[in-house]
Amino acid sequence: MKKSLLAVAVAGAVLLSSAVQAQTTPEGYQLQQVLMMSRHNLRAPLANNGSVLAQSTPNAWPAWDVPGGQLTTKGGVLEVYMGHYTREWLVAQGLIPSGECPAPDTVYAYANSLQRTVATAQFFITGAFPGCDIPVHHQEKMGTMDPTFNPVITDDSAAFRQQAVQAMEKARSQLHLDESYKLLEQITHYQDSPSCKEKHQCSLIDAKDTFSANYQQEPGVQGPLKVGNSLVDAFTLQYYEGFPMDQVAWGGIHTDRQWKVLSKLKNGYQDSLFTSPTVARNVAAPLVKYIDKVLVADRVSAPKVTVLVGHDSNIASLLTALDFKPYQLHDQYERTPIGGQLVFQRWHDGNANRDLMKIEYVYQSARQLRNAEALTLKSPAQRVTLELKGCPVDANGFCPLDKFDNVMNTAAK
């Protein structure tokens, strides 16, 4: 079943018409280099006995067909579609040729060394370049975090730990989550959960969060924010996977507004842990340095296309570390959606003989993910232009490359 489903997805992606119109770009502009920082695609939640999920409801969790945390079959299909769409876009911009494999060393794929990230990269390459010999690079030891993608605290001083915890507490204090917790308690029947009956923890609203910023560990939190994130993450993954709606959160989510209220918990968890400047600049430093090397220091010799696959924590901390302006993603509840990509694009304006940078968030809408909609330039992924505070964009979303270089050089120090 899995193999046939994926075979259909790959074949369908290849057969979809490539005679489509490109996104309009100013006359004389030529795309020269692209770096995509992607979040892995659809995975199964962690619902082991004794986990946060099992402790938070008397209800039984639906079964998944892969172990917790691993990329699902549908996640592979979705990533094939994203790869195919990206290939169409790259061809339309003239960066790679149509109908043939890219020249050697044109495309470089690098993923964190977990199953869901490596598999995501493999499916993306299959969708973008079917039949082409393009390896996915990763650490040899699977199941361990690659330092480039590992968002851990690297400052072991007590002063930094205190600053980081205070920054996370401040970010949490700016969130208004009571309505979200109330709805979550109703959906999970939290009053009847093991947490309430056995541990006497019966109110997510009244409980307190405790943050940590320990050396060589990810920023952490214990308390209702962690519980809320775990539960809403599981509901979101069920929705994307295509579970019947009476099985998604046991049929407890009926409206778009309820999704938005619940998603405040997941987004708030990420914002609290990974988007304060103090924490983000520290945990994203290895990734910032890698991107600076590819897009700035070594750009003349770098591959035309670089594909990086990591996690939502990588994207969230990177957005803060580089000081992007606030953004809104339409048709999505997540701030850093499953399978979504930050797409850095280096362009040359031949008319004015100048180099430019454009950065977009490219992602699948919640509906596209649930319905497994094939992506083409005629039925595209969603695209939202992002702006760095240090590199103001023009009406078409482009900023001067020298200003982008300054942003990267400062962030990579």
Curated annotation (Swiss-Prot):
GO terms for cellular component: outer membrane-bounded periplasmic space. It is found in: Periplasm. Substrate binds at R39, R43, R116, E218. GO terms for molecular function: glucose-1-phosphatase activity; sugar-phosphatase activity. It is an enzyme of class 3 (hydrolase). Residues 1-22 form the signal peptide. The keyword Iron does not apply. It catalyses: alpha-D-glucose 1-phosphate + H2O = D-glucose + phosphate. The keyword rRNA-binding does not apply. Keywords: Hydrolase, Periplasm, Signal. Its main location: periplasm. It holds the Pfam family His_Phos_2. Coiled coil: none annotated. Its EC number is 3.1.3.10. PANTHER family: ACID PHOSPHATASE-RELATED, GLUCOSE-1-PHOSPHATASE. Homodimer. Belongs to the histidine acid phosphatase family. This is Glucose-1-phosphatase. It comes from Salmonella typhimurium (strain LT2 / SGSC1412 / ATCC 700720). The gene is agp.
